[in-house]
Structures are given as C-alpha cells and as structure tokens.
C-alpha cells in the first residue's frame, strides 16, 4: 500500500507472525477454518537489530560542547544527558536520584545503588570521575523540567553530533551499555546488574550478585577511561 513502510527486519516479521498465529489458532479451534497453516509453516525469528548509541568520538564531542557552552539552559540538559550516559540510568531514575540515599562506597569507590522505577529491579552503577564532575556542577541533584522538552532539545544536539538516528533519552542508556561499559571490557553479566535489566533465565542469578563482586569485576578500567 502506498505510504506504508516496508518491513525489512526478520525480527519484525516474526513478531507480526507471532501475533497473527494466535488468531489463526483460535479460528481453527472454533472450526472457522479447516486447517491451521502454522502447523506446516515456521517463520524464522531473526536477530534483533542493534540498539542505536553514540560512539566514543561522539561522546567526547558532547563533553567538549558542555565545556564550551555558556548557556545555562543548554548546560542543564547536556549535564542530564551526560549523567545518564555515564550511569546508564533511565530518565525517571536519573530524575529521582538522591545522592545521600543512593550513594554507597565499595573498595574506596562510590557507586549508585538504587531500584529502577519501571521494574523495581536493583541496579548498581559506578560514580566515574566525569560523573562526579557533573554532580558537583549541579549540587549533587539532577533537575530537569520535562521529558518532552528534554527530548526536543536532544533533537538539536543529535544534529550537531551528525547522528543517523533521533537522539532521545533512551540513547544515553544504550550508549552507557555499548560504549562506556562494554567498550571498556565490562562483562554482559555485570552490565545486566549495573543497568537493572530483567531476564527470565538469569534474573535470580543477577539479583544475588553481591556488590563486592560487581566492584571487583568493574575494576579500574572504566574509572581511568572516563575522567
């Protein structure tokens, strides 16, 4: 049909089949159709597409933009996005961050220990040197007016960074995972706990990861890389 986007992702096609399959099965059960075509047909699941994220070069450009900016409003938005980028915290979690309540010290280093508002899952993420600078600039409280205005501002920042995708609050979280953490050799096991991800197969395992274990596996590499 004219104006309809072409579905190119096998994962997206699989999801359409998954939803449609349940209706076909119900129609077959009720006798509305003579046979269930899905009994002889299986679609491939496909691989999930990569999450868009900023590269290390783009992150460093963003840091320079903040250092050179004298606009108070722009600085507040930039700091909030950078705070998300270097903690992996979702918008709602970053907005409700309380330094006195959420900071713990392990092996002489500070970490943010909290629970995700969306899922209730615990997360522990390091306070990197650059994160501390951001907190100091904002009196240890990250404040922002609204998510809508924040995303509007980020569209302009995305253009300045030559992003091939819309820059949103979610991109900061993806950037933490792909560039800040995995890019410095953090294991997926530790990253999952740091971000408070939910996984049916491993939730119980990660929920029991002691903070000492997380600290030992993060090591000094992230702290040295992002000053």
Regions found by a protein language model. Give the residues of each.
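A short, basic/aromatic helix-end/turn motif that makes direct DNA contacts
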Residues: 96-102, 170, 192-198, 207-209
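C-terminal catalytic core of tyrosine-transesterase DNA break-rejoin enzymes
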Residues: 82, 86, 173-201, 205, ...
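Short, basic (Lys/Arg/His-rich) helix/loop patches that form interaction surfaces
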Residues: 68-71, 137-144, 152-193
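DNA/chromatin major-groove-contacting recognition/catalytic segments
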Residues: 123-129, 133, 208-227
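Short, charged phosphate-coordinating catalytic segments
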Residues: 25-36, 84-108, 189
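N-terminal core-binding DNA-recognition domain of tyrosine site-specific recombinases/integrases
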Residues: 1-25, 30, 70-73, 143-149, ...
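Basic, Lys/Arg- and aromatic-enriched nucleic-acid-binding interface segment
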Residues: 6-10, 14-16, 29, 33-91
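Conserved tyrosine-mediated DNA breakage-rejoining catalytic core shared by Y-recombinases
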Residues: 52, 58, 87, 96-134
């Amino acid at each position: 049909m004219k104006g309809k986007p072409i579905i190119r992702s096998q994962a997206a096609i699989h999801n359409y089949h998954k939803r449609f399959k349940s209706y076909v099965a119900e129609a077959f059960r009720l006798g509305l159709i003579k046979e269930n075509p899905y009994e002889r047909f299986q679609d491939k699941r496909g691989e999930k597409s990569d999450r868009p994220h900023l590269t290390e070069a783009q992150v460093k450009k963003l840091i320079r933009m903040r250092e050179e900016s004298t606009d108070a409003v722009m600085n507040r938005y930039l700091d909030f996005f950078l705070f998300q980028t270097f903690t992996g915290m979702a918008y709602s979690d970053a907005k409700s961050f309380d330094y006195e309540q959420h900071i713990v010290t392990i092996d002489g280093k500070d970490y943010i220990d909290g629970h995700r508002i969306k899922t209730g899952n615990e997360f522990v993420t390091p306070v990197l040197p650059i994160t501390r600078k951001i907190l100091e600039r904002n009196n240890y409280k990250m404040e922002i007016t609204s998510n809508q205005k924040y995303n509007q501002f980020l569209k302009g920042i995305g253009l300045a960074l030559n992003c091939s995708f819309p820059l949103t609050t979610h991109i900061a979280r993806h950037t933490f995972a792909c560039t800040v953490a995995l890019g410095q050799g953090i294991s997926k096991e530790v990253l999952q706990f740091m971000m408070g991800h939910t996984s049916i197969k491993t939730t119980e395992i990660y929920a029991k990861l002691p903070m000492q274990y997380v600290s030992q596996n993060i090591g000094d590499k992230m702290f040295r890389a992002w000053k």
